[in-house]
Amino acid sequence: MYIWLDRALEYFSYLPRNEPKLQLWHDFLLWSASQVCEPLNRDLQIRIIARYGGDIRTLFMGAYRAITAGVAEDPAQNVLLHLAVEFGVACPSPAQYAGETIDQLFVQRVMDLTDKSDPDVALAAADGITIHLANCDKDYGSSMIAMANVVRNRFRANYQEKAIFVSGGDGNEYSYLAPFIQLAIMGMPCYASPDGPILCGDQQALFAPQSAFCSAEFFSSYWTKVRRAELWRMNRRM
């Protein structure tokens, strides 16, 4: 077992035993999302702490730091799926995502978005795209995490300017938060919302709804310019 996972489970072993595990897990995901989002959602954290008492902050923060270490150790692993399985609130994902397969899916997605038939030409033209995963129930966002790693590996110099990753919608409880938390820790532009994305005219999810948790990179100067350009383009159409 991973050292980071041992540490996270040690903190979890002190969680209130009289509370349902699934409720504790949902609140941990909400607390972690509010910790990693920009700006930090302190009001939500205060409400969660008030539900259990002050000790819960120490336990959640300890587990959160452990998963952060896990992402730093190997960003390709789905840290929250590992933790959910060991905590007993999820089953091992039946879906296995080979890096090659995800790479092919990403290239095809870029070719579709850029309307280029040549993969190399399409990748060179790929800027300002969004990747949306509506249903995270089956794999806790493993496919999105794998695709984010493909983006980081293919575009090492400017991977934060290639794609926004969006999870949420389709009534998938709190599992939509899992890929967001990991990708935000990885430094990727991303957001998560139970309401799903706001789609522009070209089906790009550049804008986040009010209910969204957003990573710091979502508000970078690059993506702010992209959104302004999209607003200008939409206004011209009116």
Residue ranges with predicted function:
Residues N158, L177-L231:
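S-adenosyl-L-methionine
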Residues F165-D170:
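Conserved SAM-binding motif I beta-strand of class I
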Residues R233-M238:
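Extended alpha-helical scaffolding regions
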Residues M1-Y159:
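Class I S-adenosyl-L-methionine
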